[in-house]
């Protein structure tokens, strides 16, 4: 079956329509497609080198320095399965790895509670290149894990720190100092407000937890009663029928409390 390639000629066809006057108005996508035209090569070509680090993707492991296994045998060459895996990777898209992603993963693994802080979607649209990362605190941007990442990269690019771990530690310690300062300021502001008569009610999360705890307590009380009933039934089957009859006479919704949100 012949590969259909008419869709990739949309730029040339639209240009001809504009030139001949068939189209009076330039489409909104015209300039974008002109800057990044679609590819016309549909043949899969093997990528022998990785585009990120330039390493060969066909190189097999060197077994010359390998030690003997438990049987006392040495492995001197790759087997057919290893050769097959190496050949199949030539046509796969290489994974793009950025140092920023590694720093973000490390930071949030060490500080998982930073993910629980509220965040608005507008913060993701801010360009980090507009800020001066010679200091970690920025005007108009909240202090978060991304500040640590960008501060670390600035220390590496400026030459203040030559090692990645040293730059990350310095940015992390600056983050700790500012975070402690913010928490102290919030605590002092709350104490001053309470001193002047302000009353802080429970938050939505605390209110939900309290309602949930009431349901859990009701369930626990019923579970204990059911466990006692089963134990009594196992020890004295004749007496258990009397208790069971009394339990059936009770209204079903006696211990159920309506949760008003």
Swiss-Prot record:
Predominant subcellular localization, coarse grouping: mitochondrion
One MF annotation (Gene Ontology) recorded for this entry: structural constituent of ribosome
Pfam families cross-referenced by the UniProt entry: MRP-S25
Region of interest: Disordered: 233-261
Keywords of this entry: Mitochondrion, Ribonucleoprotein, Ribosomal protein
One Gene Ontology cellular component annotation held by this UniProt entry: mitochondrial small ribosomal subunit
Keyword Ribosomal protein included in the entry's annotation: yes
Compartment annotation: Mitochondrion
Subunit structure, interactors included: Component of the mitochondrial small ribosomal subunit.
Family from the record: Belongs to the mitochondrion-specific ribosomal protein mS23 family.
Stated name of the protein: Small ribosomal subunit protein mS23
Species of the source: Kluyveromyces lactis (strain ATCC 8585 / CBS 2359 / DSM 70799 / NBRC 1267 / NRRL Y-1140 / WM37) (Yeast)
Name of the encoding gene: RSM25
